[in-house]
Every structure is written in C-alpha cells, then in structure tokens.
C-alpha cells in the first residue's frame, strides 16, 4: 500500500486522540450487536444475549482494547502492514477459523466509531485515509487464507 504524506498525517493525527480502551470496546461490542453471527467466535465470553449484556461484558471490553491496540501497530507500521499482521493472520485462519469477511466488517465498524467520536476531525479526506487503512489491515489479516 502506498501512503501519501497527507494520508499518513490524517491517520496518525487522529490516532493520537483515540482512547484505545473506549473505542476498542465500542467497536467490538458494535460488531457483536450489529452482526450477531460473529458472536460464535466469542462463546467463552459468557453473556452476549443482548446489547446491554454485550456492552457491559468485561471480556468484550478487554478484547476490544486488545484488538484496537493491535490495530495501533498498523498505524505505527503503515509501510509494512502485511508483516505486522502475519502472525495474527495465521492465528485467525488456522486456529480460530474466522471468516475473513469479518475483518472487513470490523473495519467498517471502526470507521463508524471514529466518526462518532471525532465528528469534527473526521473529514471526508480523513475518512478516505482511514478506509484505506482498515482495508489494508483486513487484507493483511485475510492473507493467510489466500
């Protein structure tokens, strides 16, 4: 993926404002609520029976933070996203058997969360840069499937 200086600035500038624990928890909770079939990968998380149960679930919150912390590695390694996610791709493909489409869905959810939290800063140019990033991350995570 080729990044312009402006795209890198838009991504890193917004990322510096992100509360990883809060936005990560919200993104994963939204994924599980909006796309309930994704819950099957989180059976060990206990009660996921309602939106309230999901948003209040400490395991969802913790894993959401973990997911977004990992996403931060992409922000730090924009020029080497494939290598950054090689091990996670292997884990999600070989061991967890996650449908790679779910990576795209989570990326789209993250865009919504960022837009909701940073409406003023989340300009169309910023969104375009972030869409490119979540697409690159989803592709890198799905790489082991190809």
From Swiss-Prot:
Q: What is this protein called?
A: Hemoglobin subunit beta
Question: Assembly and partners?
Answer: Heterotetramer of two alpha chains and two beta chains.
**Keywords noted in UniProt:** Heme, Iron, Metal-binding, Oxygen transport, Transport
Picking any one GO biological process from the record gives:
hydrogen peroxide catabolic process
Q: Which residues form the Globin domain?
A: 2-146
Give the source species: Phalacrocorax carbo
Q: What else is known?
A: In pos. 135 of beta chain, other birds usually have Arg (the positively charged AA contributes to the formation of the phosphate-binding site). Here the non-polar Gly reduced phosphate interactions, and oxygen affinity increased.
- What does the function comment of this entry state? Involved in oxygen transport from the lung to the various peripheral tissues.
Sites where the protein binds heme b? 63, 92
Instruction: Mention any one GO cellular component term assigned to this protein in its UniProt record.
Output: haptoglobin-hemoglobin complex
Q: In which tissues is it expressed?
A: Red blood cells.
Pfam families according to UniProt: Globin
The molecular function GO annotations come to:
haptoglobin binding; heme binding; metal ion binding; organic acid binding; oxygen binding; oxygen carrier activity; peroxidase activity
Cell division: is it a keyword of this entry? no
**InterPro entries (alphabetical):** Globin, Globin-like_sf, Globin/Proto, Hemoglobin_b, Hemoglobin_oxygen_transport
Concerning its family, UniProt says: Belongs to the globin family.
């Amino acid at each position: 993926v080729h990044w312009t200086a402006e795209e890198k600035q838009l991504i890193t500038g917004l990322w510096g404002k992100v509360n990883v624990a809060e936005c990560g928890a919200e993104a994963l909770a939204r994924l599980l609520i909006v796309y309930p079939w994704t819950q099957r990968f989180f059976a060990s998380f206990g009660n996921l029976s309602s939106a309230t149960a999901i948003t209040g679930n400490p395991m969802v919150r913790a894993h959401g933070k973990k997911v977004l912390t990992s996403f931060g590695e992409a922000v730090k390694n924009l020029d080497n996203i494939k290598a950054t996610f090689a091990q996670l791709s292997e884990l999600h493909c070989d061991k967890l058997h996650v449908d790679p489409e779910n990576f795209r869905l989570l990326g789209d959810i993250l865009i919504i969360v960022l837009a909701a939290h940073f409406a003023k800063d989340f300009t169309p140019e910023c969104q375009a840069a972030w869409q490119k990033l979540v697409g690159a991350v989803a592709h890198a995570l799905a790489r082991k499937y190809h």
